[in-house]
Structures are given as C-alpha cells and as structure tokens.
Swiss-Prot record:
PANTHER family (alphabetical): CYTOCHROME B (PTHR19271:SF16)
Residues where a ubiquinone binds: 201
Role summary: Component of the ubiquinol-cytochrome c reductase complex (complex III or cytochrome b-c1 complex) that is part of the mitochondrial respiratory chain. The b-c1 complex mediates electron transfer from ubiquinol to cytochrome c. Contributes to the generation of a proton gradient across the mitochondrial membrane that is then used for ATP synthesis.
Source organism of the structure: Parantechinus apicalis (Dibbler)
Keyword Repeat: no
Binding-site residues, heme b b566: 97, 196
Cofactor notes: Binds 2 heme b groups non-covalently.
Recorded topology in the membrane: Multi-pass membrane protein
The protein, known as: Cytochrome b
Entry annotated with the keyword Disulfide bond: no
Length: 381
C-alpha cells in the first residue's frame, strides 16, 4: 500500500513541498530565510488577529484602544510588542533574503524573482498602513507625508490623494480603510507566498556554487527541516529578546503622543526598514522626481535579471562583483542612517551621493564587472 502522505490529495502537496522535496546538498544558512519569512508571516497574522479583536479603527478611540490592549488585555502588551517587533524581524529577513538572491544569482529564476519583488512591495504596503493604526503623532504625520506624495502625479495627483484619504486630509475615513487594508493584505501575501513556492519548486532551489545541482540532491526532511528549526530558534530568540527587554528600541518616541493635526513633529521619519527609501525620496529637491526615484529604488529589482552579464550565475567565484555587492550593502546601510538624520549638512550631500552610487552600482558597475570577469576568464594564448 502506498504511504498516505504520497497518495492523499492534500498531504501529497505538503509531502512534495516540505518532506520529499529534492534539495541541493550544499545550500548554506543563507537559504534559511525563506522558511523564517514564512514563520514571521504566521506570527504576524496570529498576533495581528488577536490585536484586531481589541482594536478600534476610529480617530477618537484608536490611541486609547492600543493603550487598553497594553494595560488591560491578558498578555496584550506581549501581543503588541511581538507584532511591532515581529515586523522588524520580518524586514530583516526580507532584506537578507533579497541580498542572498542577488549574491547567488537566484534572480535568474525570473518568475520566482518577480513574484518575490511583488511580495516585497505588498509587505511594505502592509507595514505602512499598519504603522498608521496606533494613531500616534508619527503615525499621523507619516501617513500625511507619504500619501501626499500621490499629489505629485501630474493632472490626477490631488484627486487621487483625496480619494485615498476619503476627504481633504488624513482623518477618520483614512484610518478605517487603512485598518481594512492592513487586515486583508497579509492574506494576499500568504497567497502570493504560495505562488512564489510553486514557481520555486518548478525549477528547484539554486545553490551557492550556481552550478546545476541535479546530480547531487537530498530529501528536504530531515536534513533541512532540522536546519530550519535551528534558524527558527535564533529568530525566536532575537524576537523575544527585542520584544521583552527593549520593545520600544526601534519605535519612535513621538508615537507615545496621540495624533495632533495642529502640531508637526520636528523630524518626520518612517520605521527603520523604510529609511533607505525615504533617504532616496528626500535626496531629490523636486517632488515628482523624488517619488519616481523612490519607486525606482524598489522596482529596479525587477530588471536585475536583465542586467546579468556574467557567464557564471553565482558571485561565489567572482571577486570584483563580490566587492561591488558589499559596497552596495554598505551603501544601503548608509542610506538607512541618512534617512533618520535631520535635513542639514553634511547629511544632505551624503544623502545625495549615496542614491547616485546605489543606481550606478546596479545599472552600470555590476553589469560591467560581469563582462570584465568574463574577459578575464578567457584563455589569453
């Protein structure tokens, strides 16, 4: 008799995805982040669901309802801290996952990569609307500044911004619809993640060498289930340390004050995971130019497969590309730092040079490095 997990219609899918899946034998810890992102999503959906049971999406009571969750609801403080810091862990894993994809050439699985970029955009949208919900000062002003960017679109901009707001400014209608979006988007993310996996399993995983691994594969379970479990332990340790010992470390002190449309905070800035994009947005004095640069900074990921010029897939044996990759990493960290600084010298000039280097590296230097490495590998005799 056939094993049930191989014959049952539902168990068969799970078996082919997580148990008997043929996996390259040499994938490193950099391949752990996919499963960690899945765990992050589950944590966020569960904590978010329980928070939504006690939250009210009304401008008069939203701030109080969050305080009520932290003070009066059983373990409400823990749910809130896990949810807020879980978002940070989510983005940390996301950035490392995307970085891994760029370094090892995983973007050559174009469908998987493109759905991944759409996933990244959807998660960013979810985090943005979620940040507005506590209705603190930075929630309100962050929403005002970012939604206002829509008004930079020629001709239809102002109408579009007012349509999103549901009025002439960020108000009750905006908060209510943002809560609706924040509730539905994680389920869309879950569906997209399944499609992401579906396309990944069509081709199989890439591996650090970038060479076709078909000749040497092992079953996912128990080898990689145990490896993912170790990664999960580290993730949970980091999340619990953050949520239990310094839950407000990554938050903004302005969010302890209820939203006040008559009082603007001295420095409006988003959460740390958006600072790199915010720095690129601020680096261009023109409003529309800034918005386009902001979009380009993320959407540029979609054209990375077209910019691959090297004969080798992975950067493992390409030292020049490796150097440029780590310069790009340092550049993104610099952008994150600049995004959190006030608009004054020397931050202005650094904030203008860093985005230029960002686009130069991806669009020009890295493709040229690939061509140069091809040339260097050709026999010269």
């Amino acid at each position: 008799m056939t094993n049930l997990r191989k014959s049952h219609p539902i168990l068969k899918i799970i078996n082919h995805s997580f148990i008997d899946l043929p996996t390259p034998s040499n994938i490193s810890a950099w391949w752990n982040f996919g499963s960690l992102l899945g765990i992050c999503l589950i944590i966020q959906v569960l904590t978010g669901l329980f928070l939504a049971m006690h939250y009210t999406s009304d401008t008069l009571t939203a701030f109080s309802s969050v305080a009520h969750i932290c003070r009066d609801v059983n373990h409400g403080w823990l749910l809130r801290n896990l949810h807020a810091n879980g978002a940070s862990m989510f983005f940390m894993c996301l950035f490392l996952h995307v970085g891994r994809g760029i370094y090892y050439g995983s973007y050559l699985y174009k469908e998987t990569w493109n759905i991944g970029v759409i996933l990244l955009l959807t998660v960013m949208a979810t985090a943005f609307v979620g940040y507005v919900l506590p209705w603190g000062q930075m929630s309100f002003w962050g929403a005002t500044v970012i939604t206002n960017l829509l008004s930079a679109i020629p001709y239809i901009g102002t109408t579009l911004a007012e349509w999103i707001w549901g009025g002439f400014a960020v108000d009750k209608a905006t908060l209510t619809r943002f809560f609706g979006f924040h509730f539905i988007l994680p389920f869309i993310i879950t569906a997209l993640a399944m499609v992401h996996l579906l396309f990944l399993h069509e081709t199989g995983s890439n591996n650090p060498s970038g060479i076709n691994p078909d000749a040497d594969k092992i079953p996912f379970h128990p080898y990689y289930t145990i490896k993912d479990a170790l990664g999960l332990m580290f993730l949970l340790l980091a999340l619990l340390l953050l949520a239990l010992f310094s839950p407000d470390l990554l938050g903004d002190p302005d969010n302890f004050s209820p939203a006040n449309p008559l009082n603007t905070p001295p420095h409006i800035k988003p959460e740390w995971y958006f600072l790199f994009a915010y720095a690129i947005l601020r680096s261009i004095p023109n409003k529309l130019g800034g918005v386009l640069a902001l979009l380009a900074s993320i959407l540029i990921l979609l054209i990375i497969p077209l910019l691959h010029t090297a004969n080798q897939r992975s950067m493992m044996f390409r030292p020049i590309s490796q150097t440029l990759f780590w310069i790009l990493t340092a550049n993104l960290i610099t952008l994150t730092w600049i995004g959190g600084q006030p608009v004054e010298q020397p931050f202005i000039i650094i904030g203008q040079l860093a985005p230029m280097l960002y686009f130069l590296l991806i669009l020009v230097l890295m493709p040229f490095a690939g061509l140069f490495e091809n040339y260097m590998l050709k026999p010269k005799w």
